[in-house]
C-alpha cells in the first residue's frame, strides 16, 4: 500500500490517532455534485419562516409581575429579622449543637438582647454571606411590639442592670450619679428623674403636652432606645403615682421605667440638667427648679455664702412664740426655700447646738419680758391674740348657777389677780362633774398659765414652772397633796418670797404667782388643815355641769368668753389702764434682738 499524503512525522506527545488521515474518493464527490445541481434550489421543508403579523401578548403584565416579585423579595430581606420559619426553628436546636470551632464566652458582651439597632447593623454587614433563603411568613402585628419588648426584658436576669447599662451607653453618665435612692415607693417628692426604655415617638411627643398640667418644669431628652425625664410636679408624688401616670401616658410597662428623685445638693448634677437644657435636641418647659438655680446662678451662690446669724433665728422664734426646741427646728427649717439665713442654718454642721441655744435665748427673753410686765399688761397682751366674739354673761351665769354670789366672787377674783398676800390662792371644790377643771383650765388657757402635776412631787423641781408664768394651777388636789401644801407651801401661799430649787441652776428667790386649786375635799371642814383656811379663798361648785340635748355645754367657757369678761369688768377688777403703762394704740416698738440692717428702715 502506498503512503498517504499528509504529515507523517508526528510530534512527541501526540496520540496515535493523529497519524491517521482521511481518504478522499474523487468518484463519489463528482456524483454528488452533479446530483445537487440537478435537484436545484427547491426544498421539501414548508413554512420555515413565519411572515404573519406579530401579537403584543401580556408582556407588560409579565413585567409588572416580575417587578412586584423583585420588590417583595427586597422587602422580605429587609424584614427578615421579624420573620420566623418553622423549619428553621425545628432545625435550630440541632444546628446549635454542631460547632466546628470551639466556643468562647464573651466577657464584654453582657446582654444578648438588644433594642434592634445593633443587631440590624450586624445583619446588614452579613447580608452578602447569607445563603439560606427563609420562606416568608406572617409579619408580627404592631400591637404586639411592646409585648415583645417586655418579654425580652423578662428574659434578662437583672432588668435594672440592663436598663442602667443602656442608659449609660446612651447618655454617657450613670443614672445613679444623677439621682438619690428611695427604698420605699410610697415616699413623696416633688422632683423625679425617670428613664424609659423603648417608647414610641408619637407617644413621647404627646407626653410633652399632657405633662404640662401636672408639672412646673419638664426636661426631656431622647437617645434611642432610652429617653430621660426630669419632672418637677406641682405637688409631691410617690413613685407609685409617678409610674402609674407615665405608664398611662406612654403605654409602657413599669418594668421599662426607672424612677428616682434627683440629687438636690450636687453641683455636677445641677450642671448636667442646666447645660442639657441648652441642647437643641432637649425639650424643656417651665422655669428652672430652685435647686438648679441655687447651684448654677451666680446670685444664688452669693446668697448661699451668707453666714448664719443666730439672732435672726431667735427673733423668728420670739415673734412666733416658739420656745420648744423641736418646734423651732421644724418651723425654721421650712423657711429654707425663701429665707437665706434658714438655708445657711440647714447647711450648718451644728444644727442641734444652734437650736438649743436659740431655745435658751427665747426663754430668757420671755422670762425677762414677763418679769417686767404687770398683771394688767400681761392680761391685755394675751387678750390681743384672741380672735372671735364671745359674751361675758356665760361666765357670770355659770358662777351664779353654782349658787355663788357674783359680787363676792368678783372681789375675791380681783385680790387673786393682784396677788394680794394671803389671798393669792383660790380653791374650787365640790363633787365630780361640776365643771371645776373646765372653769379653771379655760382661764389658764387664755392667760397662758402653767399647770403643775403633783405626780412629780418626789422631784425637787416639780414647782419650777411657777418661775416662768403669771398664773398657775394644781388640778385635783388630794389629801397627800394637801399634806404637802400644809407642810411646805405655807409661806408661798402667804405671798412672801421663797427659795425655789431650779434644775441646772442655783436656787432662786421668787414670789409665787396667783395659784388656783381644784379638789373634791372641803378643807374648811377639815380640822387638820386649819392653818390653810386663812390662806385659801374657797368656792363650792355643788351642781353638775349642764348639757343640752345635743350633749353640748350650756355655758360656753371659751377664750372669747373670758376676753369679753375681762373687757367688760376691767375697771371693776381694778386693772390699770394701758395708756398709763405706755400702750397708747400699739405705738410701742416691738422687741428686737437682731441688729438693724444697713439698708433697713429708720
From Swiss-Prot:
Q: Which GO terms describe its molecular function?
A: ATP binding; ATP hydrolysis activity; DNA binding; DNA helicase activity
**Residue segments, region DNA-binding region:** 142-305
Compartments (UniProt record): Host nucleus
Which annotated residues bind ATP? 430-437
Residue interval(s) of motif Nuclear export signal: 91-100
Q: Which residues form the SF3 helicase domain?
A: 404-554
- Function field: ATP-dependent DNA 3'-5' helicase required for initiation of viral DNA replication. It forms a complex with the viral E2 protein. The E1-E2 complex binds to the replication origin which contains binding sites for both proteins. During the initial step, a dimer of E1 interacts with a dimer of protein E2 leading to a complex that binds the viral origin of replication with high specificity. Then, a second dimer of E1 displaces the E2 dimer in an ATP-dependent manner to form the E1 tetramer.
**Official protein name in the record:** Replication protein E1
Amino acid at each position: 500500500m502506498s503512503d498517504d499524503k499528509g504529515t507523517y512525522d508526528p510530534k512527541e506527545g501526540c496520540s496515535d490517532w493523529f497519524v491517521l488521515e482521511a481518504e478522499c474518493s474523487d468518484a463519489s464527490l463528482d456524483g454528488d455534485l452533479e446530483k445537487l445541481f440537478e435537484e436545484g434550489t427547491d426544498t421539501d421543508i414548508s413554512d420555515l419562516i413565519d411572515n404573519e403579523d406579530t401579537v403584543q401578548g401580556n408582556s407588560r403584565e409579565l413585567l409588572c409581575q416580575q417587578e412586584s416579585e423583585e420588590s417583595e423579595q427586597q422587602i422580605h430581606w429587609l424584614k427578615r429579622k421579624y420573620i420566623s420559619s418553622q423549619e428553621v426553628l425545628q432545625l435550630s436546636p440541632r444546628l446549635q449543637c454542631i460547632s466546628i470551632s470551639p466556643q468562647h464566652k464573651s466577657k464584654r458582651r453582657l446582654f444578648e438582647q438588644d433594642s434592634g439597632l445593633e443587631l440590624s447593623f450586624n445583619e446588614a454587614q452579613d447580608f452578602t454571606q447569607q445563603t439560606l433563603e427563609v420562606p416568608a411568613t406572617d409579619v408580627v402585628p404592631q400591637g404586639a411590639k411592646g409585648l415583645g419588648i417586655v418579654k425580652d426584658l423578662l428574659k434578662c436576669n437583672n432588668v435594672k442592670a440592663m436598663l442602667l447599662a443602656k442608659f449609660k451607653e446612651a447618655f454617657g453618665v450613670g443614672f445613679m450619679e444623677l439621682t438619690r435612692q428611695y427604698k420605699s415607693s410610697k415616699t413623696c417628692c416633688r422632683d423625679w428623674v425617670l428613664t424609659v426604655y423603648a417608647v414610641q415617638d408619637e407617644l413621647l411627643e404627646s407626653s410633652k403636652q399632657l405633662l404640662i398640667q401636672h408639672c412646673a418644669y419638664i426636661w426631656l431628652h431622647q437617645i434611642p432606645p432610652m429617653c430621660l425625664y426630669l419632672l418637677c410636679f406641682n405637688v409631691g408624688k410617690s413613685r407609685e403615682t409617678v409610674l402609674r401616670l407615665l405608664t398611662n401616658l406612654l403605654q409602657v410597662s413599669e418594668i421599662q421605667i426607672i424612677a428616682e428623685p434627683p440629687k438636690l445638693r450636687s453641683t455636677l448634677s445641677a450642671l448636667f440638667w442646666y447645660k442639657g437644657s441648652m441642647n437643641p435636641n432637649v425639650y424643656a418647659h417651665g422655669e428652672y427648679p430652685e435647686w438648679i438655680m441655687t447651684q448654677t446662678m451666680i446670685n444664688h451662690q452669693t446668697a448661699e455664702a451668707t453666714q448664719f446669724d443666730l439672732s435672726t433665728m431667735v427673733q423668728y422664734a420670739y415673734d412666733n412664740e416658739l420656745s420648744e426646741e423641736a418646734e423651732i427646728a421644724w418651723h425654721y427649717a421650712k423657711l429654707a426655700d425663701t429665707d437665706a439665713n434658714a438655708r445657711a442654718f440647714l447647711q450648718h454642721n451644728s444644727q442641734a447646738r444652734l437650736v438649743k441655744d436659740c431655745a435658751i435665748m427665747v426663754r430668757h427673753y420671755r422670762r425677762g419680758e414677763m418679769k417686767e410686765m404687770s398683771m394688767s399688761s400681761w392680761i391685755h397682751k394675751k387678750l390681743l391674740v384672741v380672735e372671735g366674739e364671745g359674751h361675758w354673761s356665760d361666765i357670770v351665769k355659770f358662777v351664779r348657777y353654782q349658787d355663788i354670789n357674783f359680787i363676792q366672787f368678783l372681789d375675791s377674783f380681783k385680790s387673786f389677780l393682784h396677788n394680794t398676800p394671803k389671798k393669792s390662792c383660790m380653791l374650787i371644790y365640790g363633787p365630780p362633774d361640776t365643771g371645776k377643771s373646765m372653769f379653771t383650765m379655760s382661764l389658764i388657757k387664755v392667760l397662758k398659765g402653767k399647770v403643775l402635776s403633783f405626780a412629780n412631787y418626789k422631784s425637787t423641781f416639780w414647782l419650777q414652772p411657777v418661775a416662768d408664768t403669771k398664773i398657775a394651777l394644781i388640778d385635783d388636789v388630794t389629801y397627800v397633796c394637801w399634806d404637802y401644801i400644809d407642810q411646805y407651801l405655807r409661806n408661798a401661799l402667804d405671798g412672801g418670797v421663797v427659795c425655789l430649787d431650779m434644775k441646772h441652776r442655783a436656787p432662786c428667790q421668787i414670789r409665787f404667782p396667783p395659784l388656783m386649786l381644784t379638789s373634791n375635799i372641803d378643807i374648811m371642814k377639815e380640822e387638820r388643815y386649819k392653818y390653810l383656811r386663812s390662806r385659801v379663798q374657797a368656792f363650792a361648785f355643788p351642781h353638775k355641769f349642764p348639757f343640752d340635748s345635743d350633749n353640748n355645754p350650756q355655758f360656753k367657757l371659751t377664750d372669747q368668753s373670758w376676753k369679753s369678761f375681762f373687757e367688760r369688768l376691767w375697771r371693776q377688777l381694778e386693772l390699770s389702764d394701758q395708756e398709763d403703762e405706755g400702750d397708747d394704740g400699739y405705738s410701742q416698738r416691738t422687741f428686737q434682738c437682731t441688729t438693724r440692717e444697713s439698708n433697713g428702715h429708720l
